[in-house]
Amino acid sequence: EGVRLVQARGQAMSQVKTGGMTAILGLDGQTVETLCAEVASTGLVQVANWNSPFQTVVSGEFRALEAVGTLSKERGAKRVVQLNVSGPFHSRLMEPAAQAFAEVVQDLELRVCHTPVLSNDGQSMLQDPGDIRRSMVRQITGPVRFTDQLHTLVRMGVTEFVELSPESLLIPLARRSQPNLQFTLVSDGGMV
């Protein structure tokens, strides 16, 4: 069932071909969010990923991405990097994908989770099947608040961060936000 969902989500998201994503390093997320509002007349652009205190990813239409990138440099960003991605993920431009995925998720048989799942909003702990369905759809157009997720987990008493990945992508971001956590990478070759 999980593989079918991943395939359906990917298929729905691949249909949205307008727009992209840009990483902004050296400015805090609130500043980047303000800059997005300042360039709104050029097109849709919004914060897509709150990765670390000074790394934020924006998503939107190309003209607006260019405008927010230029303004970010003027306001002191250390780097602005256009990401090599196929769409404007975690933005309102993905609404057609969210609607298509909602149709798939509505018939999904889910049970109440024994272990709560932390939502992309960084604060909501989900167990109810209806809440999980709504969150699965919302995360297609909504931002990933990774920094908030880490803060929430630390407040809950989490002391170790385990990344399951061929290479360490999240650990460097997590370390910037929560340096006191213990970090472990589990890759194809075992624990690193």
State what each model feature region is.
Residues 1-143, 172:
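Alpha/beta catalytic cores of group-transfer enzymes, especially the acyltransferase/condensing modules
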Residues 138-192:
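Flexible, low-complexity segments
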